[in-house]
Regions:
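Start-of-domain marker
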Residues: 18-77, 81-84
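Outer-membrane beta-barrel "beta-signal"
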Residues: 102-105, 208-235
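Outer-membrane beta-barrel transmembrane domain signature
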Residues: 109, 113-200
Length: 235
């Protein structure tokens, strides 16, 4: 746990020293395991353009998942996504107020201690005056450091890359990259700090943004031997 705290402080210092470049990206996600097959998930996110300043975005979402087996998982989710203009903390009027519904398939496979997660998602997105479809694919990789599996008292490194595609120009909408470390303290609490680069493509311009991300994951599972978790966000 001490090593995770040191890494967190170092990454915070790096982000603070580049305050104009780094935003903050905070995530709290929870999972309630109802049975061997069914779970309920929810997630809260808060993002800022500067390091814990100029907050411009939040999202609240949740879903229900069904586990076919340890390697195949289906999820139905919905959420509210709100974006504010730049220049302050939650400056009005809103830039975007979105309601979203999505269907998701997650497939896991293992190569010795290396864990791979393939996530496919189809999104239906409703805005005030428009509707859009979007399709996403994420490859997530995790490697436990001090244990063979990711479980209680385990440090790990993790990275993912995700592409966002639409059915309208410019079609390739976004690329999101993450690299970080994590620590699963016990069977219900995981802490994962890391770096995110999000690059957006539009018809007239393309722009990227750096974030310091901190994720806190809470899983409530009454089973004596809970399944090995693949670290990552609902988003």
């Amino acid at each position: 746990m001490r090593a995770c705290v040191i890494v967190l402080l170092l990454m915070s210092q790096i982000a603070f020293s580049q305050k104009s470049d780094f935003g903050s990206w905070n995530v709290i996600n929870t999972k309630l395991v109802l049975s061997e097959r069914w779970s309920v998930l929810n997630e809260l996110q808060l993002r800022s353009q500067s390091f814990y300043d100029n907050h411009y975005y939040y999202e609240i979402k949740g879903g229900v998942s069904y586990s076919v087996n340890k390697n195949f998982l289906f999820l139905l989710g919905t959420g509210k996504y709100v974006t504010y203009p730049d220049g302050g903390n939650f400056v009005k009027p809103l830039s975007s107020d979105e309601f979203r519904f999505w269907q998701q398939l997650t497939m896991n496979h293992f190569l010795e201690r290396l864990k791979f997660e393939h996530r496919y998602r189809a999104e239906q997105r409703w805005f005030k005056d428009s509707y859009r479809n979007r399709f996403r694919y994420r490859l997530n990789v995790a490697l436990p450091i001090n244990n063979k599996k990711i479980g209680p008292k385990t440090f790990y490194v993790a990275s993912f890359d995700e592409i966002f595609l639409t059915n309208k120009a410019p079609y390739f909408e976004r690329n999101r990259f993450f690299a970080g470390v994590g620590y699963q303290a016990n069977k219900w609490l995981t802490i994962q700090p890391g770096y995110v680069n999000q690059y957006d493509y539009k018809n007239d311009v393309a722009q990227g943004k750096h974030f310091f991300q901190l994720t806190i994951g809470i899983e409530i599972d009454a089973h004596k031997d809970p399944k090995e978790k693949m670290p990552g966000n609902v988003d």
